[in-house]
C-alpha cells in the first residue's frame, strides 16, 4: 500500500509540474462544462394507420394484423426510451455549441431504425400469403385424389431397363430407387415393369448378389450397340436416311423419283427367262425396262419357286451389285418397296450404269468428330434426362435475399411474437445418399446423363457431344435434410492482442526487481512466473524486444518423438542454462531397476529345437554310414560285427555330442572348429547373437515354427537383453565373462552384489543426454526425451517410464547457491517454496529432474508463459543423436 501511495504522490507532483509549465507558456484553461440537464425535442411516434391500411389491403387476418402492429409499436417505444437516456447522458459532456449536432444524430438514428422495422412489418403480409398458398396446395393435393394425374411411364428409358435386366432380373430396393431417379419414374413403376418382364421371360433369369457389381466394359459395349440400333429412330427427321415408302416422309412425285433414281442407258431389253434372276453374262447391256411392277413380281415369284430347299428372306432395300475380280458380275434383285408398286410410268433401272474403275483413296479419319451424324449419335447414345427426372446439376440455391447488415438481423428479435419463421430451402430429392446401391456405382459413367468429354475418364469416339456435367449431390440440403447447426463458437481472440497483454504482464512482474520493498508478497502463480523469467535471464528492458510464442514445442533438434496429445503449453529449450542454474539435477538411484528379458523364453526354445535338429541330423548320418559300412563288409565277405560293439560307439558318440552341445556356448572354439563348426554350435551361436529383436536366424525360426515378439508399443517397456546373451562378432566365438565385460564397459562397484545382468553405462550420464518438456497440469508427467547412450543407439519415448511428484522431494535451496551472483539475486525469494521433482527411468537407470515449484500445494502450476529459447546463430544441441534432423528452433 505504501508503494502505491508513493506512486500516486509522484503522479500528482508530475501533473502539477506539467500544469505550471503549461501556464508559464501561456496556455488558457478551458471553460467549465455545464452540468444542467439538456432537453431535446420529443421524437415522433410511428405512423401506424398507414401500415394498418396496407396490411388490410392484402387481407391479413385481424389477429395477425393486431399482433404485428403491437410488436412494432412496442419496439419503437423501447427505442425512443433508449435514445433519450443515452443522449441525455452524452449531452452533459458535450459543449453547448455542438448540441445541435447531437440532436440531429439522435433524430436520424430513430427514424432510420423505425423505417427498417416498418419494412419488416410490411413483409409479414407477403410471407403470410405465401404460407397460405402453400397450405392450400397441400390440402388440395392430399384430399382431392380423383384428379391426381396418373404417373407417366417414360418409354424412352425402356432400353435402359432391358439392358439392366440382361445382367440382373431381380434388382434390389436401392437399385430400383436409383433406376427410378434416373428414368424420372416412380419406384412402383420400376417394380411392376420388372415383375411383368420376369413373367414374360423364358429360360433361367440372371440374378446377382447385392454386393456384386455390373461389369462396366460389357455394359458400355452393350449400351453402345443398343444406341446404334436405335439411331435411325432417335435421329431428327432432317438427318434420317431417304428411303422410298417411308411413312414419315412425303410421297415422291414422278419428277422427284426420276431425280432420285440413277440415269438409265438406252439398250435392248433382255429376254425374261428363269436364268435371269440367277446369272447375267458380262456382254449383256440391258436397256431401260418397260415392265410394270406386277410383271416384276411375277418374275420374282418364278425365280423363287424353283428353290424348293431354301426360302430366301426378302428385305426392302435398294438393288445391290456385287463386284469381284475373279467372279462374273451377279445381280441380286429384291422386291421393291410398296410405294413403287403400281406406278407404270416410272423407268426402273435393273442394272446400274457401268462406272469406270478408279483407285479410290481412303479418307483419313480425323480425330475431331464435328459432323452432324456423329453429334446425332452422341445425343442418341447419351440422351438428356427426362424433365420429370430429379437430376442434381448443382447445389440448390435459395432465392431469399441476404440481410444487408447484421444489425438488421439482430433487430428482428425485438419485434416479439408473430414473426414468420425462415422458410427452409426446397428439397430437390428425397433419396438419401446412403441408400445408393454399390452395384450401380459401375453405371455412374454417363449412361443417361449428359457429361463433358474427358479422354481419361470417358474414352468415347466423339468430343463435342455434351455441354453440361452431371454430379451426384452429397450435401444434406439436396436430400431435404436441414443443415447441421454448428455449435462451435468463433474464435475472436487476436494473437497481436494476446502478445501485447503478455508483454505488459511480464513487464509488470519484472518491475518488482526495481522496487525497494517486496510487501505485500506476490501470489503463488505470479511468483513462479517471475522466477521463470529471471531464470531466462531477461531484464525489464529486454522483455519488450523479445517475441514470445506460448504454444511452442520442445527443442526439435533433441526430441525424437512427440506424443500426439494436447499441445504443450510451455517448453524448456535452453537446457544448458537451466543446468547451470541447477534447475535440473541428474541423479542415479542406489537401486537400479532391472527389467526382465522378454526374449529369454524364445531364445531358449530356439536353442532346444536347434539342438534337437542337430541330434537328429547326426543320428541320420551315423545310420547312413553304418548301412554303408555294413554293405561294404558284406561285399568284401567280412564277418558281421556284434550288436554290442556297434551300439557302444553310438551311445558314446551321442553322449559326447550332447556334452559338446552343452559346452559349445560356454567355451572358446579354435580357428579350425570355426571353419568347420558343427550344426549344433552354429545354431546355438546364431540363437545367442546380439541382433535385437531378431535374436535367432531364419532357419531357427522356420524350424521352431513360431515368430519372435514384435517391437514393444508405447504402453510397453523396452526389453533389456542380459549381457550374457550378447555375442561379439569376430573370427572366434567369444563367451562373455566378468573380465571381458569389465574391459569393454568398465568396472562396476556394485557388480559383485547385483550381478552381471544389469545394464552398464560406459561413461557417466551427462546433462547433454536428455531434453524434457512439461505439461499443462504442472508436473512433468508427459515428457519427451532423447538419450544418447553409447553402444545402444537411439531410444524412443515409448521405451521409457516417467513418474512425477510435486513437492515430495524438496531439497535445500542453499545447495543451489553455487550458480553465482546472478542466481543468488533471486534465490532468497524461492527459499520457502517446494520443488517439482520428476523421475525418469531410461534403460534401467532412474534420473530426477527438478524445476521450480510453488509455495501453495493446491495452486496449479502455470507454465503458459514459460519459454526458453536458443540464440539465432547458436546450436546448443549439435551433439545430439537426432533422427528427425534440422537445426532451426521456433521460439
Swiss-Prot record:
GO terms for cellular component: nucleus. Keywords: DNA-binding, Homeobox, Nucleus, Transcription, Transcription regulation. The keyword Transcription regulation applies. GO terms for molecular function: DNA binding; DNA-binding transcription factor activity, RNA polymerase II-specific. Residues 241-291, 319-339, 393-437, 610-718, 800-822 are annotated as: Disordered. Residues 244-257, 800-818 have a biased composition (Polar residues). SUPFAM superfamilies: Homeodomain-like (SSF46689). CDD domains: homeodomain. Residues 146-205 bind DNA. Residues 427-437, 651-667, 676-710 have a biased composition (Low complexity). Residues 328-337, 627-638 have a biased composition (Basic residues). Gene3D superfamilies: Homeodomain-like. InterPro entries: AalphaY_mating_typ-dep-bd-dom, HD, Homeobox_CS, Homeodomain-like_sf. It is found in: Nucleus. GO terms for biological process: sexual reproduction. Specifies A-alpha-1 mating-type. May regulate the expression of genes specific to the homokaryotic cell type. This is Mating-type protein A-alpha Y1.
Amino acid at each position: 500500500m505504501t508503494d502505491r501511495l508513493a506512486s500516486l504522490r509522484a503522479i500528482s507532483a508530475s501533473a502539477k509540474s506539467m500544469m505550471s509549465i503549461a501556464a508559464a507558456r501561456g496556455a488558457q484553461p478551458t471553460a467549465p462544462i455545464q452540468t444542467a440537464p439538456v432537453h431535446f425535442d420529443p421524437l415522433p411516434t410511428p405512423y401506424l394507420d398507414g401500415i394498418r391500411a396496407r396490411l388490410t389491403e392484402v387481407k391479413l387476418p385481424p389477429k395477425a394484423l393486431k399482433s404485428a402492429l403491437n410488436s412494432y409499436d412496442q419496439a419503437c417505444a423501447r427505442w425512443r426510451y433508449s435514445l433519450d437516456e443515452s443522449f441525455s447522458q452524452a449531452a452533459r459532456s458535450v459543449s453547448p455549441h455542438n448540441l445541435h449536432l447531437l440532436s440531429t444524430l439522435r433524430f436520424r438514428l430513430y427514424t432510420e431504425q423505425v423505417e427498417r422495422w416498418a419494412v419488416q412489418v410490411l413483409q409479414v403480409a407477403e410471407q403470410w400469403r405465401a404460407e397460405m398458398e402453400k397450405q392450400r396446395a397441400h390440402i388440395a393435393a392430399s384430399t382431392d385424389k380423383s384428379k391426381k394425374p396418373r404417373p407417366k411411364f417414360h418409354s424412352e428409358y425402356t432400353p435402359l431397363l432391358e439392358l439392366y435386366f440382361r445382367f440382373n432380373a431381380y434388382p434390389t430396393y436401392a437399385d430400383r430407387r436409383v433406376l427410378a431417379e434416373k428414368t424420372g419414374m416412380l419406384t412402383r413403376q420400376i417394380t411392376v415393369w420388372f415383375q411383368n418382364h420376369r413373367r414374360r421371360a423364358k429360360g433361367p433369369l440372371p440374378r446377382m448378389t447385392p454386393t456384386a457389381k455390373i461389369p462396366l466394359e460389357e455394359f458400355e459395349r452393350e449400351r453402345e450397340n443398343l444406341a446404334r440400333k436405335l439411331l435411325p429412330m432417335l435421329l431428327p427427321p432432317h438427318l434420317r436416311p431417304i428411303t422410298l415408302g417411308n411413312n414419315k416422309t412425303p410421297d415422291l412425285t414422278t419428277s422427284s423419283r426420276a431425280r432420285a433414281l440413277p440415269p438409265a442407258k438406252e439398250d435392248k431389253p433382255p429376254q425374261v427367262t428363269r436364268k435371269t434372276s440367277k446369272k447375267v453374262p458380262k456382254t449383256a447391256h440391258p436397256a431401260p425396262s418397260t415392265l410394270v411392277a406386277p410383271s416384276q413380281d411375277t418374275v420374282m415369284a418364278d425365280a423363287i419357286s424353283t428353290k424348293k430347299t431354301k426360302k430366301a428372306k426378302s428385305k426392302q432395300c435398294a438393288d445391290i451389285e456385287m463386284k469381284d475380280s475373279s467372279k462374273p458380275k451377279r445381280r441380286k434383285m429384291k422386291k421393291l418397296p410398296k410405294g413403287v408398286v403400281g406406278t407404270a410410268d416410272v423407268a426402273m433401272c435393273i442394272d446400274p450404269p457401268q462406272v469406270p474403275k478408279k483407285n479410290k483413296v481412303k479418307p483419313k479419319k480425323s480425330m475431331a468428330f464435328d459432323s452432324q451424324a456423329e453429334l446425332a449419335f452422341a445425343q442418341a447414345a447419351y440422351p438428356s434426362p427426362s424433365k420429370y427426372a430429379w437430376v442434381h446439376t448443382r447445389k440448390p440455391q435459395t432465392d431469399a435475399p441476404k440481410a444487408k447488415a447484421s444489425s438488421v438481423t439482430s433487430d428482428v428479435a425485438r419485434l416479439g411474437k408473430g414473426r414468420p419463421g425462415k422458410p427452409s430451402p426446397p428439397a430437390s430429392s428425397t433419396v438419401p445418399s446412403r441408400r445408393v446401391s454399390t452395384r450401380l456405382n459401375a453405371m455412374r459413367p454417363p449412361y443417361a446423363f449428359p457429361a463433358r468429354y474427358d479422354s481419361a475418364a470417358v474414352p468415347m469416339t466423339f468430343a463435342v457431344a455434351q455441354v453440361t456435367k452431371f454430379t451426384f449431390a452429397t450435401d444434406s440440403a439436396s436430400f431435404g435434410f436441414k443443415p447441421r447447426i454448428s455449435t462451435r463458437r468463433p474464435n475472436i481472440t487476436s494473437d497481436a492482442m494476446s502478445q501485447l497483454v503478455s508483454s505488459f504482464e511480464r513487464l509488470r512482474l519484472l518491475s518488482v526487481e526495481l522496487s525497494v520493498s517486496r510487501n505485500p508478497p506476490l501470489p503463488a502463480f505470479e511468483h513462479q512466473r517471475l522466477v521463470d523469467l529471471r531464470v531466462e535471464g531477461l531484464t525489464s528492458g529486454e522483455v519488450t524486444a523479445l517475441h514470445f510464442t506460448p504454444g511452442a514445442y520442445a527443442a526439435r533438434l533433441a526430441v525424437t518423438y512427440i506424443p500426439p496429445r494436447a499441445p504443450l503449453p510451455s517448453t524448456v529449450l535452453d537446457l544448458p542454462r537451466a543446468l547451470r542454474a541447477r534447475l535440473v539435477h541428474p541423479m542415479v538411484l542406489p537401486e537400479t531397476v532391472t527389467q526382465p528379458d522378454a526374449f529369454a523364453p524364445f531364445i531358449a526354445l530356439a536353442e532346444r529345437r536347434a539342438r534337437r535338429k542337430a541330434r537328429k541330423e547326426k543320428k541320420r548320418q551315423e545310420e547312413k554310414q553304418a548301412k554303408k559300412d555294413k554293405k561294404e563288409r558284406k561285399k568284401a565277405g567280412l564277418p558281421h560285427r556284434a550288436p554290442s560293439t556297434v551300439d557302444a560307439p553310438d551311445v558314446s558318440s551321442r553322449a559326447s555330442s550332447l556334452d559338446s552341445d552343452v559346452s559349445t556356448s560356454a567355451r572358446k572354439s579354435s580357428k579350425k572348429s570355426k571353419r568347420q563348426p558343427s550344426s549344433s554350435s552354429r545354431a546355438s551361436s546364431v540363437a545367442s547373437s546380439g541382433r535385437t529383436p531378431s535374436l535367432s536366424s531364419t532357419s531357427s525360426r522356420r524350424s521352431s515354427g513360431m515368430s519372435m515378439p514384435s517391437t514393444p508399443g508405447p504402453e510397453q517397456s523396452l526389453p533389456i537383453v542380459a549381457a550374457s546373451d550378447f555375442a561379439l562378432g569376430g573370427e572366434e566365438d567369444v563367451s562373455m565373462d566378468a573380465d571381458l565385460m569389465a574391459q569393454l564397459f568398465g568396472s562396476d562397484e556394485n557388480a559383485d552384489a547385483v550381478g552381471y545382468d544389469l545394464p552398464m553405462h560406459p561413461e557417466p550420464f551427462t546433462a547433454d543426454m536428455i531434453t524434457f518438456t512439461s505439461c499443462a497440469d504442472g508436473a512433468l508427467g508427459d515428457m519427451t526425451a532423447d538419450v544418447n547412450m553409447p553402444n545402444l543407439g537411439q531410444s524412443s519415448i515409448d521405451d521409457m517410464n516417467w513418474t512425477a511428484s510435486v513437492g515430495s522431494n524438496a531439497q535445500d535451496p542453499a545447495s543451489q547457491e553455487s550458480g553465482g551472483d546472478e542466481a543468488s539475486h533471486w534465490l532468497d525469494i524461492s527459499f520457502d517454496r517446494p520443488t517439482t521433482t520428476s523421475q525418469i527411468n531410461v534403460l534401467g537407470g532412474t534420473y530426477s529432474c527438478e524445476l521450480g515449484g510453488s509455495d501453495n500445494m493446491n495452486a496449479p502450476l502455470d507454465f503458459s508463459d514459460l519459454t526458453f529459447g536458443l540464440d539465432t546463430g547458436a546450436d546448443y544441441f549439435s551433439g545430439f543423436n537426432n533422427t528427425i534432423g534440422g537445426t532451426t528452433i521456433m521460439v
